[in-house]
């Protein structure tokens, strides 16, 4: 028995809500994956604020209709698709998908969309090589800490230098 029109509308609404909260989408061919493997992928994605949604291409097409930033997905909507929607740490979510694909050897990334731009395989791999948000924040914090330390040392050096000069001058005046 097929789905009713009302249940299809609810599914489309849920997909629209997921898309509204997502920064990036990947389209995977999930043919040949077991339920256990799909559950494994979903649990890996939870850690990086991503979700894996399996839905009919026609329902996804309805969800992206009128959303300019997502219409690029339309060209990828053929075959058996799982949609990875990422709202948090894009780099670590892509890494999780790639690690999963490497382990299972069953799934393939058809493409992706980030900020309205259709991504090639190379661009998706490049995103995976980016450091995580936490690593970037650590690098920025380290750089800021370094700058403030150098400023503090520089400010402290002015009176110290003046004191050394005065001491040297007074010692040269005594002899």
Swiss-Prot record:
Presence of keyword RNA-binding: yes
UniProt xrefs under InterPro entries: Ribosomal_uL10 (IPR001790), Ribosomal_uL10-like_sf (IPR043141), Ribosomal_uL10_bac (IPR022973), Ribosomal_uL10_bac_type (IPR047865), Ribosomal_uL10_CS_bac (IPR002363)
GO molecular function, one term: structural constituent of ribosome
One record GO biological process: translation
Gene3D superfamilies the record matches: 3.30.70.1730, 6.10.250.290
UniProt KW keywords: Ribonucleoprotein, Ribosomal protein, RNA-binding, rRNA-binding
Signal sequence, start to end: none
GO cellular component: large ribosomal subunit
One family name in Pfam for this protein: Ribosomal_L10
PANTHER family reported in the protein's UniProt record: 39S RIBOSOMAL PROTEIN L10, MITOCHONDRIAL
Role noted for this protein: Forms part of the ribosomal stalk, playing a central role in the interaction of the ribosome with GTP-bound translation factors.
Subunit structure, interactors included: Part of the ribosomal stalk of the 50S ribosomal subunit. The N-terminus interacts with L11 and the large rRNA to form the base of the stalk. The C-terminus forms an elongated spine to which L12 dimers bind in a sequential fashion forming a multimeric L10(L12)X complex.
Entry's family note: Belongs to the universal ribosomal protein uL10 family.
Name of the molecule in the record: Large ribosomal subunit protein uL10
């Amino acid at each position: 028995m097929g789905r009713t029109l009302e249940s299809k509308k609810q599914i489309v609404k849920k997909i629209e809500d997921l898309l509204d909260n997502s920064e990036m989408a990947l389209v995977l061919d999930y043919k040949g994956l077991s339920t256990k493997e799909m559950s494994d992928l979903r649990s890996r994605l939870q850690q990086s604020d991503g979700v894996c949604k399996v839905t009919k291409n026609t329902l996804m097409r309805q969800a992206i209709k009128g959303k300019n930033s997502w219409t690029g997905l339309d060209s990828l909507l053929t075959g058996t698709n799982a949609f990875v929607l990422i709202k948090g740490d894009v780099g670590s979510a892509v890494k999780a998908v790639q690690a999963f694909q490497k382990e299972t050897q069953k799934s393939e990334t058809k493409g992706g969309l980030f900020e309205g731009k259709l991504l090639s395989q190379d661009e998706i791999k490049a995103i995976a090589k980016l450091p995580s948000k936490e690593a970037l924040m650590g690098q920025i914090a380290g750089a800021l800490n370094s700058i403030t330390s150098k400023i503090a040392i520089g400010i402290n050096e002015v009176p110290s230098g003046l004191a050394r000069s005065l001491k040297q001058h007074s010692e040269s005046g005594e002899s």
